[in-house]
A protein has these predicted regions:
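N-terminal small-domain helix-loop-helix segment of the aminotransferase-like
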Residues: 5-95, 102, 276-279
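A short helix-loop-beta submotif of the ANL/AMP-binding
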Residues: 130-135
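Short strand-turn motif at the edge of the Rossmann-like AdoMet-binding core
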Residues: 34, 119, 168, 199-201, ...
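Short acidic capping loops at alpha-helix termini that bridge into adjacent secondary structure
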Residues: 84-90, 110-113, 159, 221-224
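PLP-dependent aminotransferase class I/II
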Residues: 223-281
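Active-site phosphate-binding strand-loop segment of PLP-dependent enzymes
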Residues: 136, 142-208, 212
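Conserved PLP-anchoring active-site segment centered on the Schiff-base-forming lysine
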Residues: 106-128
């Protein structure tokens, strides 16, 4: 038998895979993963067919279809008041998970520490470990799963390379407030700490709450990656299409890894989202 050391000795099949298999086996309603029990908009589905029939079946640009990046730039600017250059600050990814892994792979090296709020989406920890980093957990507190920012401050040191935030939060559903983002901004001021903001549930928010994107805060924007997904918003999780926003100097490093990770993302689907978003609120 060939001997080797596992890079993830404690990792097993994800709970999402286990629960989804059980749901299929027993024809049960699946509440374990973030996808709906109804189909995507038929117009969006038809637009994929149109794109394929129009010949968009070969490799797209590594950074993604420009028309889609331009639409994303416009939408983000309208929502949060920050302009991201579609040429140099937006990259289309093969889902948010690929974007998250690419950010971590581009910047985390052996000995780096990454603060992660727990409980957390189960991708963060193994992605950090695979790149030699160390997860520093901060546990959300109380019935409202709030953040103890004093604890965060205590855990920041010279080895802290990144803080991962996720709002609206998976799995608790808690929403970061303006006060939270301002506290974060204050803590990382005058440091080289990067922020990875997972915002895949940004448009799935209720009770008149407001999504406080990192993109609303200029001092955070300059050190942050914002990762999002069309799958959650438009009920197309199997299409694995998302995007990443970051200032040019950070996005340059992201794209270096992205090109060797997936090279590019699904071509006709990008054109479909581009056209669909142009006529969507």
């Amino acid at each position: 038998m060939i001997y080797f050391d596992s890079k993830l000795p404690n990792a097993t099949t994800t709970i999402f895979t286990i629960m989804s298999n059980l749901a299929r086996e027993h024809k049960a309603i699946n509440l374990s993963q973030g996808f709906p029990d109804f189909n995507a908009n038929q117009k969006l589905i038809d637009l994929v067919t149109v794109a394929m029939n129009n010949g968009f079946n070969q490799y797209p640009p590594v950074e993604g279809v420009l028309n889609l990046r331009e639409v994303i730039s416009q939408k983000v600017n309208e929502l949060y008041g920050t302009y991201y250059d579609p040429n140099s600050e937006i990259t289309i990814t093969s889902g948010a998970s690929q974007g998250i892994f690419t950010v971590i792979s581009a910047f985390i090296k052996k000995g780096d520490e990454v603060i992660v709020f727990q409980p957390a989406y189960d991708q963060y920890e193994p992605s950090i470990q695979l790149n030699g980093g160390k997860v520093i957990p901060v546990y959300l507190k109380g019935a409202d799963y709030s953040i103890n920012w004093e604890e965060v401050a205590d855990k920041i040191n010279s080895r802290t390379r990144m803080i991962v935030i996720n709002t609206p939060h998976n799995p608790t559903g808690t929403i970061f407030t303006k006060i939270d983002l301002l506290r974060l901004e204050s803590l990382v001021k005058d440091t080289d700490i990067l922020i990875l903001s997972d915002e895949v549930y940004a448009h799935i928010i209720y009770d008149d709450q407001i999504h406080e994107s990192v993109s609303r805060y200029p001092k955070l924007v300059e050190r942050s990656f914002v990762v999002s997904s069309f799958g959650k918003t438009f009920h197309t999780t199997g299409w694995k299409t998302g995007y990443c926003l970051a200032p040019k100097n950070l996005m340059t490093e992201f794209r270096k890894v992205h090109q060797f990770n997936v090279f590019c993302s699904n071509h006709p689907i990008q054109h479909a989202f581009s056209e669909f978003l142009k006529c969507s609120d």
